[in-house]
Design a protein with these regions (language model features):
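Non-transmembrane functional regions of envelope-associated proteins
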Residues: 1-188, 224-225
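Membrane-proximal, cysteine-centered motifs at transmembrane boundaries in secretory-pathway
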Residues: 146, 186-225
């Protein structure tokens, strides 16, 4: 290579190569790059940020989808303890439901929240939707049966927390109902609760739908809820 090369790119490479403090500059640049990478890792670690906010709030309810199906043996692996503690323990059979095989819808697997977030949740509930044969959704599975345990839906968990109730306060009457304190929710024999149709009130829907962005940006105050 000649220093008077007419190719500007080659000339720049030559100048860079001949520089006496080349390695010193490289080390400095690499150190700077490490710092930038560390900052990027911190900025992109959204799980840690979410975990921190959940630990501060102490009232976050997480969802957990189950895989529906009929168990033929034992589960492949046990669910983590932060999921197990959400299993319902007050299960009553007043109508001989078990002898008739009347149980909630069964599952064969679950996808729990990640370990970084699960232990920080106020509670965890299933997020499964059970459509009718025509695809319409007319009912809510308040409880699912996962092998020998019963897990509430996220809707049931939220309702319980809004009443200042814990999982131990949720009572399941097989093939009959679910009780939240003094509130009794009638169900079918699979603990499915029928959802109701609410017609519009004049020109307005029965339930107003707000934009998440409007709430998040402060356009709609949180006090509304």
């Amino acid at each position: 290579l000649e220093s008077n090369s007419k190719n500007k790119a080659i000339a720049n490479i030559l100048s860079f190569y001949l520089e006496t403090n080349l390695h010193n500059r490289l080390n400095q640049d690499l150190d700077s790059l490490k710092a930038r990478l560390f900052e990027a890792e911190q900025a992109l670690d959204t799980d840690s940020k979410l975990a921190k906010s959940m630990a501060s709030a102490k009232n976050v309810v997480l969802s957990m989808p189950f895989v529906l199906g009929v168990p033929r043996g034992n589960p492949d692996e046990a669910l983590p303890n932060y999921v197990l503690k959400n299993a319902l323990t007050t299960i009553l059979d007043r109508v001989q439901a078990q002898s008739q095989g009347l149980y909630p819808i069964t599952t064969v697997a679950a996808i729990p929240p990640i370990e970084q977030l699960g232990p920080l949740a106020s509670s965890i509930g299933h997020l499964n939707v059970i459509p009718d044969i025509d695809g319409a959704i007319r009912s809510e599975a308040l409880v699912l049966k996962h092998y020998d345990r019963f897990y509430p839906s996220i809707a049931l968990q939220i309702a319980a927390r809004s009443l200042n109730l814990e999982n131990a306060d949720i009572k399941v009457n097989l093939a009959e109902s679910v009780e939240l304190g003094s509130l009794q929710i009638k169900t079918d024999d699979q603990l499915m609760m029928n959802t109701f149709f609410y017609s519009n009130i004049g020109d307005f829907p029965a339930f107003q739908v707000d934009s998440f962005y409007d709430v998040f940006s402060g356009k709609i105050p949180l006090d509304k809820y």
